[in-house]
Amino acid sequence: AMTDGILGEKPWYEVKNRKFLCPVPGYDRHFAITEHFGFELINVPMLSDGPDMAMVEELIKDDTVKGIWCVPKYQNPTGITFSNEVVRRFAALKPAAKDFRIFWDNAYCVHGFGEKSDEIIDIISECEKNSNNDMVYEFCSTSKVTFPGSGIAAVASSPANLNDLRGFMKYSTIGPDKINQLRHVRYFKNSAGIKAHMQKHAALLKPKFD
């Protein structure tokens, strides 16, 4: 995005006074990335059900606003999960910038305690309903499941966005660590295996919060 642009748009480094929306309090590592690349960070207050969407809807009328960071489930550091209404309002956004992107970091998608786990509707299908197929990148990883910094990661998005990302990534890596991918598949086997593994984490952590 910084050097090549997104889907034919101007590279972000050429956009003067570029801005990025940051729900606060939030994840400092996210904010540090966009700060490093010269973005003005705009604070968006977190409410009890997610970011202040009225403020987001107003700010994206500026075409120098290029994106927003989101941790939609158990958001750092408050633990808030976005409501269905907030997710739908995200999916219905009409930003001035064609290359505005929601960076949807679903880092805690499998991190409930016991049978109690917040549910969140699928942002990608909601975007499709609003003809905003390209507006979101959704990320997840096993960093907080298996090995911090040495697990596996995934991104979900529209076919156009994924083709765009593949075009960037082919210059930075020959391919993923397939042995590590196989290691994870053989250990977990399926989604039930992931759930069972996470309950072991829960058994260790839950007493600290009781």
Task: Describe every region a protein language model picked out.
Residues A1-K98, C109-N130:
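Conserved core of the PLP fold type I
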Residues P11, K61-D62, A96-A97, N161, ...:
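Serine/threonine-rich low-complexity intrinsically disordered regions
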Residues S125-K206:
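Conserved core segment of the aminotransferase class I/II
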